[in-house]
């Protein structure tokens, strides 16, 4: 679980997302409150529930990007889902309970990786011994029984030294490695994924853990043996309990496109993929118990962050009960020309930096002048205003169009330096930007 302060979280998000300070502050406070809650006594901790967040803003302003970056910062079970993929219980499609099942699977993977890393040193020692046994097989007595290995024998120590120095990495040995589990592919109808995964687990466990001799390079065998030995040191039941605890205490669910499940106008008949989904989400967000293959999971303290553009609907179109369960509202602002300029240069691995690195692989040196970047930002903003406003995603389209000629000819331009200034941008983009019909379809 992350112990970063809200200021540190916002600073980290600033490295990737331009503007949207109020949204960054809201998620930073929510993330820090997870840590604060865990410092409380057990009785009070149980009473403190997370304040769920609703992020409102046009497409392409950073809602999903905030979720992606938050997942890396949280160091807690995290899952991002699209609200449009679910239908009401009893109809064909995914049920909302699968969100918690997927979150628990994600936690299992995270906790298993942490446990393996914790036991890595011991696993490496055991893997090393198995490779040395394959290189210097233990002697057998007159009755054909394997004698105890002499750990300090000169030959074994010599091979150990060579192994650690990497001299034997490319040498092939025959060694007993775990056989791949029986692969059974089952095509599941929508909504039956849980049953399918249980059937697959059952088939995989039928044969037990078998090994078979394989001839492999030592460096490849070493990696696999470390995984095998580390897995032996991990208690599966303990892992399950730790994963369930992590989900219940620190789990975060990000629900994207929640505006797409708002009811639109008066309609007769059941609305199974809109209002029905909202009603199914209510108990999940309020707190209920979900049955997963790893055990029962309580959702009382899972943090839910929902986001939507709300261009053809408003948050008031959500059912009142759901609105009440998303008490913190954050509005993200549409991007300006200045924001586009900053997006092109400031974030880590910005778009301009990416294109420079890609062209450098062909020996072409690309440089962007300040007036060139300003003109690219103006072109993107102009097209957003005249056509559909898709936010920062428009920059990808504009940049790809601008760089198309260079990208095509780069392999024949080794050693060339190209400066992209305002004149270069005007020559390549102005005609398209000025013609609304062309920009609508090409940009």
Curated annotation (Swiss-Prot):
Q: Name one GO cellular component term.
A: HslUV protease complex
| UniProt-annotated binding residues for ATP | 18, 60-65, 256, 321, 393
Pfam families, from UniProt?
A: AAA, AAA_2
Q: Which UniProt keywords apply?
A: ATP-binding, Chaperone, Cytoplasm, Nucleotide-binding
Q: What biological processes does GO assign it?
A: protein unfolding; proteolysis involved in protein catabolic process
Location in the cell reads: Cytoplasm
Q: Cross-referenced SMART domains, in alphabetical order?
A: AAA, ClpB_D2-small
Instruction: State the similarity comment.
Output: Belongs to the ClpX chaperone family. HslU subfamily.
Q: Does the keyword ATP-binding apply?
A: yes
Quaternary structure annotation from Swiss-Prot or TrEMBL: A double ring-shaped homohexamer of HslV is capped on each side by a ring-shaped HslU homohexamer. The assembly of the HslU/HslV complex is dependent on binding of ATP.
Cross-referenced Gene3D superfamilies: 1.10.8.60, DNA helicase RuvA subunit, C-terminal domain, P-loop containing nucleotide triphosphate hydrolases
Its name, as the record gives it, is ATP-dependent protease ATPase subunit HslU
Annotated GO molecular function terms are: ATP binding; ATP hydrolysis activity; peptidase activity; proteasome-activating activity
- Segments passing through the bilayer: none
Gene that encodes the chain: hslU
Q: Which HAMAP family does its entry note?
A: HslU (MF_00249)
- Give a short account of what the protein does: ATPase subunit of a proteasome-like degradation complex; this subunit has chaperone activity. The binding of ATP and its subsequent hydrolysis by HslU are essential for unfolding of protein substrates subsequently hydrolyzed by HslV. HslU recognizes the N-terminal part of its protein substrates and unfolds these before they are guided to HslV for hydrolysis.
Say if the entry is tagged with keyword Signal.
no
Q: What is its main location?
A: cytoplasm
**InterPro entries under this entry?**
AAA+_ATPase, ATP-dep_Clp_protease_ClpX, ATPase_AAA_core, Clp_ATPase_C, HslU, P-loop_NTPase
């Amino acid at each position: 679980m992350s112990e970063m302060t809200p200021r540190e979280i916002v600073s980290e998000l600033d490295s990737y997302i331009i503007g949207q300070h109020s949204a960054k502050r809201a998620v930073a406070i929510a993330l820090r409150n997870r840590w604060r809650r865990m410092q409380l006594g057990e009785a009070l901790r149980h009473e403190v529930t997370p304040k769920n967040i609703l992020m409102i803003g046009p497409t392409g302003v950073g809602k999903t990007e905030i979720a992606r970056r938050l997942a890396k910062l949280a160091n807690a079970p995290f899952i991002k889902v699209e609200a449009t993929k679910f239908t009401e219980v009893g109809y064909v499609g995914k049920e909302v309970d699968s969100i918690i099942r997927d979150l628990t699977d994600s936690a299992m993977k995270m906790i298993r990786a942490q446990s393996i890393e914790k036991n890595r040193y011991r696993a490496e020692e055991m893997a090393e011994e198995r490779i040395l046994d394959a290189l210097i097989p233990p002697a057998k007595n007159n009755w054909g029984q394997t004698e105890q290995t002499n750990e300090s024998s000169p030959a074994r120590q010599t091979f150990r030294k060579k192994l650690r120095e990497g001299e034997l990495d490319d040498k092939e040995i025959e060694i007993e490695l775990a056989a791949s589990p029986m692969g059974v592919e089952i095509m599941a109808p929508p909504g039956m994924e849980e049953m399918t995964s249980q059937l697959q687990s059952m088939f995989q466990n039928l044969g037990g853990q078998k090994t078979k001799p394989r001839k492999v390079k030592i460096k490849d065998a070493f990696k696999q043996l470390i995984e095998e030995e580390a897995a032996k040191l991990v208690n599966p039941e303990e892992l399950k309990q730790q994963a369930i605890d992590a989900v219940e205490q620190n789990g975060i669910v990000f629900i994207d496109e929640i505006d797409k499940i708002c009811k639109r106008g008066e309609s007769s008949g059941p609305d199974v993929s809109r209002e029905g989904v909202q009603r199914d989400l209510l108990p999940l967000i309020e707190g209920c118990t979900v049955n997963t293959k790893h055990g029962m999971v309580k959702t009382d303290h899972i943090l839910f962050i929902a986001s939507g553009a709300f261009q053809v609907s408003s948050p008031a179109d959500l059912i009142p009960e759901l609105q009440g369960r998303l008490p913190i509202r954050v509005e993200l602002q549409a991007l300006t020309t200045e924001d586009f300029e900053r997006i092109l240069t400031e974030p880590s691995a910005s778009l301009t930096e990416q294109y420079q690195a890609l062209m450098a692989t062909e020996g072409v040196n690309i440089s962007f002048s300040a007036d060139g970047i300003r003109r690219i930002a103006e072109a993107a903003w102009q097209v957003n205003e005249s056509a559909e406003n898709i936010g920062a995603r428009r920059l990808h389209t504009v940049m790809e169009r601008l760089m198309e000629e260079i990208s095509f000819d780069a392999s024949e331009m080794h050693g060339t330096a190209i400066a992209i200034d305002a004149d270069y941008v005007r020559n390549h983009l102005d005609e398209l930007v000025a013609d609304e019909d062309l920009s609508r379809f090409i940009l």
